[in-house]
Amino acid sequence: MKTAATIALFCAGGGLTRYYLSGWIYGLLGRAFPYGTLVVNIIGAYCIGLIMELGLRSTMLSDTLRIGLTVGFMGGLTTFSTFSYETFKLLEDGQFVMAFTNVLASVAVCLLCTWLGIITVRSLA
């Protein structure tokens, strides 16, 4: 029960962070491209690499905290469903280059950031 409560609490924090951070990004850059979703997914990709590698290489994070941060906070922060919907809407609106850019940037940059999170922890070891 402790783990489930931790996940729920962290998920709420991640969801609120996504709401405010993506809203702020859209306020800065506009909504012509799904910048807000891309930014939160990039941040989440880096952080999950960092947290998982830290959890595997040290005792700094308890299993409950690691699960709360990854399943809860990162699960609430990042969103594949919004990425899918926004990409579909770009395609539907005939914005093929923007849709392709979103897919390429989301996949490539998020994979790169996950790797950077892992490398960050490994460089500290």
UniProtKB/Swiss-Prot annotation:
Chain positions recorded as Na(+) binding sites: G75, T78
Description of how activity is regulated: Na(+) is not transported, but it plays an essential structural role and its presence is essential for fluoride channel function.
Major localization class: membrane
InterPro entries registered for this protein in UniProt: FluC (IPR003691)
Transmembrane segments annotated in the record for this chain: 9-29, 32-52, 67-87, 99-119
Pfam families per record: CRCB
GO cellular component, one term: plasma membrane
Membrane topology: Multi-pass membrane protein
GO MF terms held by the record: fluoride channel activity; metal ion binding
Domain of life: Bacteria
Keywords of the record: Cell inner membrane, Cell membrane, Ion channel, Ion transport, Membrane, Metal-binding, Sodium, Transmembrane, Transmembrane helix, Transport
Compartments where found: Cell inner membrane
Catalysed reactions listed for this entry: fluoride(in) = fluoride(out)
GO terms (BP aspect): cellular detoxification of fluoride
Assigned protein family: Belongs to the fluoride channel Fluc/FEX (TC 1.A.43) family.
PANTHER family given in the database record: FLUORIDE EXPORT PROTEIN 1-RELATED (PTHR28259:SF1)
General function of this protein: Fluoride-specific ion channel. Important for reducing fluoride concentration in the cell, thus reducing its toxicity.
Protein name from the UniProt record: Fluoride-specific ion channel FluC
Annotated organism of origin: Trichlorobacter lovleyi (strain ATCC BAA-1151 / DSM 17278 / SZ)
